[in-house]
Amino acid sequence: MKKLLALMLALVMVFALAACGDSGEATATPTPAATEPAADTTDPSAETPLEPITIKVGYMNNYGSLWSVLTAEQMGYMEEMGITLELSSFADGPTIISAMESGSIDIGYIGDGAHKLCAAGNAEIIALSHISNGDAVIGGPNVTTLEDLAGKTVAYAAGTSSEVILTNALNSVGLTMDDITAMNMDPSAIVTAMLTGDVDACALWSPESLTVLEQVEGATKLADNMTFSDTSISLASWIAMPDRVESERDMFVRFVTALFKGMDYSADEHYDEVAEWVADLLAIDYESAYNQRGDAEWLSGKEVYDGIADGTVAGYYELQQELMISSGNLESEVPVEDYVAFDIMTEAGDALYGEAAAE
């Protein structure tokens, strides 16, 4: 019996040792394998936040000046581009350019007349805004035709679209500025002069032109931009100082990108909404703002982008320059590429409408 117990104990010990041997092999430290790189959990669609910037913008007190930039602000498009706007009101384009030259503002809006200063090198166009129809030549009670302007006192604002429409109107009937008594006045003073009868006629843009037509008894619209649409064009643009366009390119591309989105929204039949924003900013009644919606052909950002690609936009500025030369406001031809930043508009448009944006 003792021998049997000893044999059984020996067998148990053998199996126990075997089990320990298996356990040792299972827990042995394996040869280190090549380290796998950690999986990248970063969202490929996430972009580095844009550095916040504040842009000082000069505008005029009308729907046309504000329709796109105010929409871009109200709809959050400027915020998307990291931009905070500081808006300042000015009487006209030349005054806005002077403010830019002094450093008071970064970007400004101009009507047709002030484009001659861009062609002269004083400013560079960073975006086409729209094709205007807000300028008009208006006669008082005793002036009912363009021919009646001869010998009359006519108020206008020199260096602005007011001067352009007046020159076109006079030339269309064989007259020049020498055939009238031309009175260079501030736009608000022109309205007052028409109301008091101190001048016989005037050349103005909206909304002042609408005010004269509504409040001056016997007033007659003698001509507007559409009168000469087959031979001329009236453009409105956004501008900046040439040296800054080169040195601070990113700021202007970001601004134009947001502006194009504002144009897309506004031009898509959102006139009532835009008019409310304009009325609130200018502290005018809604109807006054809404009535200005017919002052232009409102271009979308996509239309401007496509127009640059096919040469249409360059053609607009070339025609405008031809009119400057023929009217004596520009001495000689200047390549439009010298003062229109097509590349800024193209880069902004590429991000919104180009192949990369479609992917």
Functional labels for PLM-detected ranges:
Residues D106, D112-G113, M183, A189-L282:
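Pocket-lining segment of extracytoplasmic ligand-binding domains
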Residues A18-P30:
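Bacterial lipoprotein signal-peptidase II cleavage site
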Residues L9, M13-L17:
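Hydrophobic core
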Residues E246-E331:
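Secondary-structure end/capping motifs
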